[in-house]
Amino acid sequence: MKRLFVLLMSIMLILGVNSCRCTSDQKEVTPVVDSLAVTELVVENTISADKESVYLNHGKDYRWYETGVVLTDWLDGESDGSIEMVVNVFQVVDYIDSTSFDTYVYKYQHTQEGTVEDSVHGFWVEDYPLNDEKVTITFKDAFERVQSVNYPKPHSRQVVLRKEVGPVDANPQWIFGNSSAQIYVDAVTGEVRDWNPAFPKDTQLNYAFSW
């Protein structure tokens, strides 16, 4: 009887140890899955997060001017739309009193390693603000439209969302390309062009990417 009791206790201990090991293994696996889930950069998510950060940390009077994307691969190569970096550009007016103020330009740079905030004292004068614009075309949708059209793809990894200052009042554009060649995707209608709609077609100016 004593031997049977010892045998039963030994079996219970073995089962208990195995149960603990299974629980421990499950806890170790969970963080790995979580960490993989946050490695993909989603452009629209960074915009929302940065808007909230600017509003909470730097004041309500801000202007969202640009969102830049750096692709992992070249547009005219094997690019599948994967993203290496996203940069969101804001300008904030800091009122000192009723007659004076300072302005700062904030850039939020997102990579898989994290987010870096940079600021300079000055103005952003290259674009119209995007705050009140109805941007309905996502980055992913714009990329797919560029890949589907029969235009030569620029040798570039750069994309920017902006509403350019020009003689023609045009919608915000997703601009894919470099300083010598661009493809424009209307961020409201989705129309794809190989010329800048903010300028007459016969007086085109190439956009110089500034980041």
Where are these regions (language model features)?
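Short N-terminal edge-element motif at the start of the domain
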Residues: E28-L71
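Exposed beta-strand-loop-beta-strand "reactive/processing" segments of non-cytosolic proteins
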Residues: N57-H110, R157-D202
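Long, charged/polar, surface-exposed segments that mediate recognition or autoinhibition
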Residues: Y104-Q158
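Short, solvent-exposed mixed-charge patches
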Residues: F209-W211
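C-terminal motif of bacterial Sec signal peptides marking the signal peptidase cleavage site
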Residues: L15-R21
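Coil residues (strongly favoring Ser/Thr
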Residues: D34-S35, S53, S98, S119, ...
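Sec-dependent N-terminal signal peptides
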Residues: L4-L15
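Bacterial lipoprotein signal-peptidase II cleavage site
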Residues: R21-E28
